[in-house]
Amino acid sequence: MEITQYQSFHEGSSSRVSMNRNSQVISKIKPKIRIIHIFAPEVIKTDVKNFRSLVQSLTGKPAPGEAKTGKKRAKSRITTPQEPVCDDHQPVNRLSGFTGLLANGGNHQVKEEWGSGDQSTSNTNTYFDLEGLIQDVGEDYFSSFPMRSSSSSQVEGFIFNNNNNNNNNNNNNNNNNTNFDTKAHNSS
């Protein structure tokens, strides 16, 4: 083993590490950045006086005065009456203030942004590959969900169907396949 070169890892470091002539310098690979936007960003206009209370209401953190006095802030919970599950596994409509998938009036766009700080070659054997972690679901994935405007007070609910269909249940008693009933019903 012939030492031909010394490498210092930190500029101010006095310790040096010896390096073999056949060795190569390996730099750390910068991970790919993947940002998936499901909802369009919403612009909220406010003045300087109300900015702090707006941020606290959006993040759910209490105001400084409430934290010092020990008073608990009342959480706003949406209560809906529980409806019984139907035997025929039909979709159930519920009243809601649910805005998760219905924000911005159903005007959804899915946008992927890719980027990396360094486009050098990578050693995929030593680093965990995140490519397979998020599967490409295709364009038709989100079209299977019912989208309504935010002015609507109804949200489509789906009942988990554990018996495929009532007709198939008699024929295949031992078959325990599961599926979702995703028939769209317009209740407006």
Curated annotation (Swiss-Prot):
Transmembrane segments: none annotated. Pfam families: VQ. Coiled coil: none annotated. Residues 161-179 have a biased composition (Low complexity). A motif (VQ) lies at residues 51-60. Its main location: nucleus. Keywords: Nucleus. Residues 1-20, 58-92, 157-188 are annotated as: Disordered. InterPro entries: VQ, VQ_8/17/18/20/21/25. One of its GO terms (biological process) is seedling development. It is found in: Nucleus. GO terms for cellular component: nucleus. Plants over-expressing VQ18 show stunted growth phenotype. May function as positive regulator of plant growth. This is VQ motif-containing protein 18. It comes from Arabidopsis thaliana. The gene is VQ18.
